[in-house]
Amino acid sequence: GIGFKAGVKDYRLTHYTPDYETKDTDILAAFRMTPQPGVPAEEAGAAVAAESSTGTWTTVWTDGLTSLDRYKGRCYDIEPVAGEENQYIAYVAYPLDLFEEGSVTNMFTSIVGNVFGFKALRALRSEDSRIPPAYSKTFIGPPHGIQVERDKLNKYGRPLLGCTIKPKLGLSAKNYGRAVYECLRGGLDFTKDDENVNSQPFMRWRDRFLFVAEALFKAQAETGEIKGHYSNATAGTCEEMMKRAVFARESGAPIVMHDYSTGGFTANTSLAFYCRDNGLLLHIHRAMHAVIDRQRNHGIHFRVLAKALRMSGGDHIHSGTVVGKLEGEREVTLGFVDLLRDDYIEKDRSRGIYFTQDWVSMPGVFPVASGGIHVWHMPALTEIFGDDSVLQFGGGTLGHPWGNAPGAVANRVALEACVQARNEGRDLARQGNEIIREAAKWSP
């Protein structure tokens, strides 16, 4: 008897611990699991905890060289999902020591890694996570955050306005710059590179950045307002991405952009450090998120991707519109919008928030509403998102029958009218159309 017993044993013997009291330093995760027929929920939950932390499929003698009690993930609660057959929420607690400081990449490799391919589960979805201050404090977080951005731009008391330049592919740099100028001159705060625009044969990045910088300065001089264009620094290598960010800064641009799902968290965090050190704002686009978050029973919910981005670093992030052309439910969307911009968010299952999240002093991120919205949505958007948001109208600006600048004017007039009406105590939900119609009389 050397005390080592080889062989396969049930995960639930070691990793299902219903009487465990979670620690303040634990990283907590809620998983929606659909076990294979015949697999008990406790075994499935324990398997998730084990496979995303210290466990493997069999007992190994090297287990004796460490303290599993200290390092193992524990499934501490399981609840059936109402209205679903054979679906459960498993709550898992991970000890802080399992994760590298300041690395979203490492955190995701564990908690949303191999376990998602696990045979005993038909499907698995990460619904929410609780990041303790002990861990979140090791991350850079947003390079600047909502308050500093408002101070840099000198824009207060209203949402910010943006516009994605369309057609997204095919314009020359010169014509692209012209479209940027017209939108900014008309009254928008920002214009945006479409996420597909990197550096293609029809428009190389350096040419675009230069013509855009010219447009920025011209529009600023004529309007007396600070303007920005999200120059997309996303590239095939981290080095090339940094080169583009440096060039954007040297051209006098106030903000750059990155696709954090396709570019990856490692690249994103590097860029966030550069942006903080050099006074650049960082706009984050979420291309590829729907591949990961759209299925109800498998994948990662966007609120988890949003929390990860707040830690990795970004000043703006796309987060759905509630009213536009892309999917999103109102309460759930507002739940993760608050997770992005508030300090302290109470657990509230009706909004999809499984854990109370305390960000302590980490700056907030502007949620960006973008995708199929236009001027008639303005009252709803103002009411749903409030002041701390960026509202982006691509086709909703450039599709104006008189052209880009009048489209921009229309959006700015509508926004100012909605903010004023709200401040005067009018009901945006009920009187929205009327407010917009009134405003239109004074708009070109």
UniProtKB/Swiss-Prot annotation:
<dbReference type="Pfam" id="PF00016">
    <property type="entry name" value="RuBisCO_large"/>
</dbReference>
<keyword id="KW-0560">Oxidoreductase</keyword>
<keyword id="KW-0479">Metal-binding</keyword>
<feature type="binding site">
    <location>
        <position position="286"/>
    </location>
    <ligand>
        <name>substrate</name>
    </ligand>
</feature>
<dbReference type="InterPro" id="IPR036376">
    <property type="entry name" value="RuBisCO_lsu_C_sf"/>
</dbReference>
<dbReference type="GO" id="GO:0009507">
    <property type="term" value="C:chloroplast"/>
</dbReference>
<feature type="binding site">
    <location>
        <position position="194"/>
    </location>
    <ligand>
        <name>Mg(2+)</name>
    </ligand>
</feature>
<keyword id="KW-0113">Calvin cycle</keyword>
<feature type="binding site">
    <location>
        <position position="168"/>
    </location>
    <ligand>
        <name>substrate</name>
    </ligand>
</feature>
<dbReference type="InterPro" id="IPR033966">
    <property type="entry name" value="RuBisCO"/>
</dbReference>
<feature type="binding site">
    <location>
        <position position="164"/>
    </location>
    <ligand>
        <name>substrate</name>
    </ligand>
</feature>
<comment type="similarity">
    <text>Belongs to the RuBisCO large chain family. Type I subfamily.</text>
</comment>
<dbReference type="GO" id="GO:0016984">
    <property type="term" value="F:ribulose-bisphosphate carboxylase activity"/>
</dbReference>
<keyword id="KW-0601">Photorespiration</keyword>
<keyword id="KW-0460">Magnesium</keyword>
<keyword id="KW-0488">Methylation</keyword>
<feature type="site" description="Transition state stabilizer">
    <location>
        <position position="325"/>
    </location>
</feature>
<keyword id="KW-1015">Disulfide bond</keyword>
<keyword id="KW-0456">Lyase</keyword>
<feature type="binding site">
    <location>
        <position position="195"/>
    </location>
    <ligand>
        <name>Mg(2+)</name>
    </ligand>
</feature>
<feature type="binding site">
    <location>
        <position position="370"/>
    </location>
    <ligand>
        <name>substrate</name>
    </ligand>
</feature>
<keyword id="KW-0503">Monooxygenase</keyword>
<dbReference type="GO" id="GO:0004497">
    <property type="term" value="F:monooxygenase activity"/>
</dbReference>
<keyword id="KW-0150">Chloroplast</keyword>
<keyword id="KW-0934">Plastid</keyword>
<dbReference type="Pfam" id="PF02788">
    <property type="entry name" value="RuBisCO_large_N"/>
</dbReference>
<dbReference type="InterPro" id="IPR036422">
    <property type="entry name" value="RuBisCO_lsu_N_sf"/>
</dbReference>
<dbReference type="InterPro" id="IPR017443">
    <property type="entry name" value="RuBisCO_lsu_fd_N"/>
</dbReference>
<comment type="subunit">
    <text>Heterohexadecamer of 8 large chains and 8 small chains; disulfide-linked. The disulfide link is formed within the large subunit homodimers.</text>
</comment>
<dbReference type="GO" id="GO:0000287">
    <property type="term" value="F:magnesium ion binding"/>
</dbReference>
<dbReference type="InterPro" id="IPR020888">
    <property type="entry name" value="RuBisCO_lsuI"/>
</dbReference>
<feature type="active site" description="Proton acceptor">
    <location>
        <position position="166"/>
    </location>
</feature>
<protein>
    <recommendedName>
        <fullName>Ribulose bisphosphate carboxylase large chain</fullName>
        <ecNumber>4.1.1.39</ecNumber>
    </recommendedName>
</protein>
<feature type="modified residue" description="N6-carboxylysine">
    <location>
        <position position="192"/>
    </location>
</feature>
<comment type="function">
    <text>RuBisCO catalyzes two reactions: the carboxylation of D-ribulose 1,5-bisphosphate, the primary event in carbon dioxide fixation, as well as the oxidative fragmentation of the pentose substrate in the photorespiration process. Both reactions occur simultaneously and in competition at the same active site.</text>
</comment>
<feature type="binding site" description="via carbamate group">
    <location>
        <position position="192"/>
    </location>
    <ligand>
        <name>Mg(2+)</name>
    </ligand>
</feature>
<keyword id="KW-0120">Carbon dioxide fixation</keyword>
<feature type="binding site" description="in homodimeric partner">
    <location>
        <position position="114"/>
    </location>
    <ligand>
        <name>substrate</name>
    </ligand>
</feature>
<dbReference type="InterPro" id="IPR000685">
    <property type="entry name" value="RuBisCO_lsu_C"/>
</dbReference>
<feature type="modified residue" description="N6,N6,N6-trimethyllysine">
    <location>
        <position position="5"/>
    </location>
</feature>
<dbReference type="GO" id="GO:0009853">
    <property type="term" value="P:photorespiration"/>
</dbReference>
<dbReference type="InterPro" id="IPR020878">
    <property type="entry name" value="RuBisCo_large_chain_AS"/>
</dbReference>
